[in-house]
């Protein structure tokens, strides 16, 4: 499969990170040395399901990204409900980051100097669905670039046991550390539909009743 072309840093690293962080805390609380006490760690991940999940996310998101890029065609996608571009969107976004706040502290709250630093160009590698790209970007350039990427999370849980069989935290863990499975806020979405359907059936509606 070509699904993981843009994800040489395996997507499942997001799950490894979650497990590692949990075990570090567990080992500290239970007086174990995680790296020298010979512990064997087993998870409920099904390697076949994990590979299918990774390929599904990679294939689907790369396809949707192309549609997204074609639709916006070089225009900024951050718009308000009236369709107008949100003013100072990138500036306000960077201001909420710990990186910006640390720079501001280091530079005596001089925001002009901080933004001068944020706009300095330097060599860096960036993610693309065709593989890593070497480029020359400023921090603000990279923020603009990455804000144009669609994101996703994927988790498969066995209902009877609660075992996690597949976990994909994002499209590429090396470049996007945010884990959409663990850190993302949940919306009810389709999860609520069975409750609505059950209420309708209880009130005599058939599954084929037109609404």
Where are these regions (language model features)?
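Extended, non-catalytic substrate-recognition/exosite surfaces adjacent to catalytic cores, especially
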Residues: 1, 7-211
């Amino acid at each position: 499969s070509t699904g993981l072309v843009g994800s040489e840093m395996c997507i499942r690293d997001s799950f490894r990170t979650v497990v590692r962080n949990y075990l570090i805390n567990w080992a500290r609380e239970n007086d174990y040395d995680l790296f020298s006490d010979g512990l064997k760690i087993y998870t409920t991940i099904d390697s076949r399901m994990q590979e299918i999940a990774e390929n599904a996310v990679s294939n689907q998101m790369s396809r949707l990204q192309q549609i997204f890029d074609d639709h916006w065609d070089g225009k900024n996608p951050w718009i308000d409900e009236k369709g107008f571009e949100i003013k100072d969107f990138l500036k306000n976004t960077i201001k909420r980051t710990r990186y910006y706040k640390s720079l501001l502290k280091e530079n005596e709250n001089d925001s002009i100097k901080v933004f001068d630093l944020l706009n300095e160009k330097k060599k860096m590698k960036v993610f693309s669905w065709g593989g890593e790209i070497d480029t020359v970007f400023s921090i603000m350039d990279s923020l603009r670039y990455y804000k144009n990427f669609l994101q996703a999370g994927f988790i498969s849980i066995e209902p009877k046991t609660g075992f996690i069989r597949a976990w994909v935290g994002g499209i590429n863990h090396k470049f996007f550390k945010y884990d959409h499975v663990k850190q993302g806020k949940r919306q009810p979405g389709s999860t609520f539909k069975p409750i609505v359907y059950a209420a309708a059936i209880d009130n005599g509606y058939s599954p084929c009743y037109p609404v």
